[in-house]
Amino acid sequence: MKIHEYQAKQLFQKYGVPIPRGKAAFTVEEAKAVGAELGTFPVVVKAQIHAGGRGKGGGVKLAKSAAEVDQYAKGILGMTLVTHQTGPEGRLVKKLLVEEGLPIEKELYLSVLPDRGTSKIVFMASEAGGMDIEEVAAKTPEKIIKVFIDPLLGFKGFHANELAYGLNLKPELIKQFNAMVAALYKLCTDYDCSLVEINPLVLTSDNRVIALDGKINFDDNAMYRHKDIQEYRDLDEEDPFEIEASKFELNYIKMPGGNIGNMVNGAGLAMATMDIIQQAGAAPANFLDVGGGASAEQVENGFRIILADPAVKGVLINIFGGILRCDRLANGVVEAAKKVGIRVPVVIRMEGTNVEQGREILAKSGLNLINAKDVADAAQKIAAVAKG
């Protein structure tokens, strides 16, 4: 689960991580009121969406007067902000964060997250702050410092010192920095975070260490433990198809720009199916893993969700029947087709448990379905019919 920057900063403040003075605003009038309350200029007007790259997309502006706060708030609120993370469709901006400007001397990068490879918590830091950390890691990996923490032993002072010295901090800043790092570790572990990121973490000319930006992602599987965090969820920032799929415990991810819907059982098979669709000259419109033990109802709802996407020009169903028997899949597809109708070509490749019963159910259904002998054949057929 993702949250907005202003919500992340509320958690930072709760844990004693220094942040700029500021407040969220949901209207132009509220933005102007926050600017007036801050009392000094410049102030920063920032779009609040669940995506990075807001500055390059025109979603972050430095206002040097009350008139500019009004101008920028009017320009950003209600805009469709397109960044490298939103896809070409962009995101509608419904919230702003208005903050004080700071006398920045240096920008750093700092994050903490679980590392699956080592089963430890890792801090990542870099003097290349304010940049895309993936780009830094790819081009200049030597600029990234990593400090691993065994959760059994917990965070110790020497971990913070290792980061501070690696970032070449001035001695007078180390105490502030170390306190911040300890707080971020506690925040990450208390709330089952999958990522806590500050980019940039700024050093000011008056010797302060401040989280200028904030990003926190949470482990969805742990949200039952954190009812307070669930209240931060913004459904407007989530894909409506993904929200609908989650109601039926389906693993669905929308793929921008795709035209072939697909339903598969098993994450590995789903990813391989998406690759084969791409190789056949089409583009997958979604990732949908119905799971090994899906019911006919889940199959029905998965199929319905795929067909509800107007971008979908064809559907590929690729099932290897094990726990999910082929006859159960067939019944789910038939029920979904009866309820919502089939407006696009559908190619089905089935193998495994009760495959003959499944094929018989589909054959007797009267539905215009295209059978495929294997995955490659299925991908070629759906790509061909989708192209018309």
From Swiss-Prot:
Enzyme class, broadest EC rank: ligase
Cofactor-binding details, from the entry: Binds 1 Mg(2+) ion per subunit.
EC number: 6.2.1.5
Cofactor dependency: Mg(2+)
Residues that, per the record, bind Mg(2+): 199, 213
Domain named ATP-grasp: residues: 9-244
Catalytic activity entry: succinate + ATP + CoA = succinyl-CoA + ADP + phosphate; GTP + succinate + CoA = succinyl-CoA + GDP + phosphate
Involved pathway(s): Carbohydrate metabolism; tricarboxylic acid cycle; succinate from succinyl-CoA (ligase route): step 1/1
Keyword Cytoplasm: no
Record's keyword annotation contains ATP-binding: yes
Keyword terms, alphabetized: ATP-binding, Ligase, Magnesium, Metal-binding, Nucleotide-binding, Tricarboxylic acid cycle
Binding site for substrate: 265, 322-324
One Gene Ontology CC term in the entry: succinate-CoA ligase complex
SUPFAM superfamilies: Glutathione synthetase ATP-binding domain-like (SSF56059), Succinyl-CoA synthetase domains (SSF52210)
Disulfide bonds: none
Subunit composition and interactions: Heterotetramer of two alpha and two beta subunits.
Biological role: Succinyl-CoA synthetase functions in the citric acid cycle (TCA), coupling the hydrolysis of succinyl-CoA to the synthesis of either ATP or GTP and thus represents the only step of substrate-level phosphorylation in the TCA. The beta subunit provides nucleotide specificity of the enzyme and binds the substrate succinate, while the binding sites for coenzyme A and phosphate are found in the alpha subunit.
Protein name, UniProt field: Succinate--CoA ligase [ADP-forming] subunit beta
Species this chain originates from: Syntrophobacter fumaroxidans (strain DSM 10017 / MPOB)
